[in-house]
């Protein structure tokens, strides 16, 4: 799999960056539609995005480097090289949401109003962004048989044939799951006006899928013997259930 999409002069533009950019652009288009559903300001959403997106990239890289610091200890400058991957989505979510919270608090805007609108766009960006892992030949699962991989399209088979071995296309599993969650969140955004429900559903559903898919991967970040992504996913599921229960309970009370 060739990770280079094209060249601009001597600069190689990698598919990883192209795919992330496409995901961000389509996420913004979806947000335009969702802002109309919730009668939220799209201009405010754009301002929020301009703060959240770079914050998420920084957070995703920092999160990854913290758990893989031994790979960078002797060459710290490589910490800033994200063109070949090395972005952890959980770090991106944490930093991005924190940046948005601070910004909206400063603007005296409703946090949940805007993150509800953002949730389908975030998961859409993640669904598309996973294909960047495909082009980088990373974030795959363990070895599989030729018979198993033959059930997938030929280009997937070719991409998952790495150094003489076929691997689980876990990037594809997560991408499909994220697309399904995105569709459900758009539906939920139309059906409920309760603030916070859509965003917390995103946290819970993404975490649910990630927990199971992470168990197949061979490149997990570890805390001792625990896969960090699975630990964060469990916390995300619990947090989601707790918040949604309390949001619904509070609404019934009034």
Curated annotation (Swiss-Prot):
Enzymatic class: transferase
GO CC annotation, single: plasma membrane
Family indicated by similarity: Belongs to the Lgt family.
Residues the entry annotates as binding a 1,2-diacyl-sn-glycero-3-phospho-(1'-sn-glycerol): 130
Enzyme Commission number: 2.5.1.145
UniProt organism field: Clostridium botulinum (strain Langeland / NCTC 10281 / Type F)
Entry protein name: Phosphatidylglycerol--prolipoprotein diacylglyceryl transferase
Gene for this chain: lgt
Gene Ontology BP, a term: lipoprotein biosynthetic process
Membrane topology: Multi-pass membrane protein
Xref: InterPro entries: Lgt
Domain of life: Bacteria
Main location class: membrane
Pfam families assigned: LGT
Role summary: Catalyzes the transfer of the diacylglyceryl group from phosphatidylglycerol to the sulfhydryl group of the N-terminal cysteine of a prolipoprotein, the first step in the formation of mature lipoproteins.
Subcellular localization: Cell membrane
Keywords in alphabetical order: Cell membrane, Membrane, Transferase, Transmembrane, Transmembrane helix
GO molecular function terms listed in the Swiss-Prot or TrEMBL record: phosphatidylglycerol-prolipoprotein diacylglyceryl transferase activity
Pathway(s) annotated for this protein in UniProt: Protein modification; lipoprotein biosynthesis (diacylglyceryl transfer)
Segments crossing the lipid bilayer: 11-31, 49-69, 84-104, 109-129, 169-189, 196-216, 228-248
